[in-house]
Structures are given as C-alpha cells and as structure tokens.
Amino acid sequence: MMKNQFQLSLIILTFFILLELGVMGNVQQVKREQCHTVIPNKSGKCIFTECKSACEKLKKPVASLCLPPKTCRCYHFCS
C-alpha cells in the first residue's frame, strides 16, 4: 500500500514538473518580440517569390509579405 502511494505521488509530481516546464517554455517564446523591415520591391509588382528571396537575405526571416505598391515587409525576431 505504501509503495503504491509513493509511486502515485511520484507520478503526480513528475506531471506537474513537466507541466510547469511546458508553461515556462511558452512564456519565454511569447516574450520574443517580432520586428519587421520594409524593403523596396525591384519589379514594382507583388511577386511573392521576389519578396521571399529579398527577405531571406536579411537576418533570420520568419515570414515575408508583399505590400502594394512596390514594397516587401520581412518579419523576424528582434535581436
């Protein structure tokens, strides 16, 4: 009986530790701020591949967005 209670307590403790680690990991990810850089689009048209390749030349892009007229917005994490 005592062994079963100890095992149950250990399982519950492990569960809460893992839950806390997951929550703390999510909080740290949320704290990372996103920045964006606006760069001119060479062709003057919204071509997704052109924006994507222009944004990839910047530091660690997360996403790229083509905005009319003639601009690309590159999203990345602030350093």
From Swiss-Prot:
One of its GO terms (biological process) is defense response to fungus. It is found in: Secreted. Pfam families: SLR1-BP. Disulfide bonds join 35-78, 46-66, 51-72, 55-74. GO terms for cellular component: extracellular region. Residues 1-25 form the signal peptide. It comes from the Eukaryota. Keywords: Antimicrobial, Disulfide bond, Fungicide, Plant defense, Secreted, Signal. Its main location: secreted. Belongs to the DEFL family. This is Putative defensin-like protein 146.
